[in-house]
């Protein structure tokens, strides 16, 4: 069962995506801010990270940079999930180290296709 770390602070988004991914056979860990996301990435070594960008305490850009510059976690794929569909927003997430980018609301089939490329 692939282990997914979902870094998201919106309870509705957490509930919906965690439920849908669990039904598809994934183990889903939740971090409600970027700081906890970095800590869980180090402690749990998930197979993939889904990262929101607008997070409290530490935003998703900084969390992505920290995860991707640490030798213990740099190989973990990160897919950013953001409500912002502007190209420059996507490019800034990729520049921070994200491996892919998808928009909210989440299209589950599209997201699963992206996830399966890394798993």
Map each language-model feature to its residues.
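C-terminal output helix
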Residues: 106-115
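Active-site beta3 strand of CheY-like receiver
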Residues: 44-50, 55
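The feature encodes the CheY-like receiver
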Residues: 14, 56, 74, 86, ...
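Conserved acidic carboxylate
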Residues: 8, 32
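Charged docking surfaces used in two-component/phosphorelay signaling
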Residues: 15-23
């Amino acid at each position: 069962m692939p282990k997914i770390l979902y870094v998201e602070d919106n309870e509705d988004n957490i509930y919906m995506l965690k439920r849908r991914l669990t039904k598809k056979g994934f183990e889903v860990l939740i971090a409600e801010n970027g700081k906890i996301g970095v800590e869980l990435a180090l402690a749990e070594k998930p197979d993939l990270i889904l990262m929101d960008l607008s997070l409290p305490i530490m935003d998703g850009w900084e969390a992505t940079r920290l995860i991707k510059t640490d030798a213990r976690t740099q190989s973990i794929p990160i897919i950013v999930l953001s409500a912002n569909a502007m190209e420059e927003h996507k490019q800034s997430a990729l520049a921070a180290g994200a491996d892919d980018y998808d928009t909210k609301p989440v299209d589950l089939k599209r997201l699963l296709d992206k996830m399966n490329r890394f798993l």
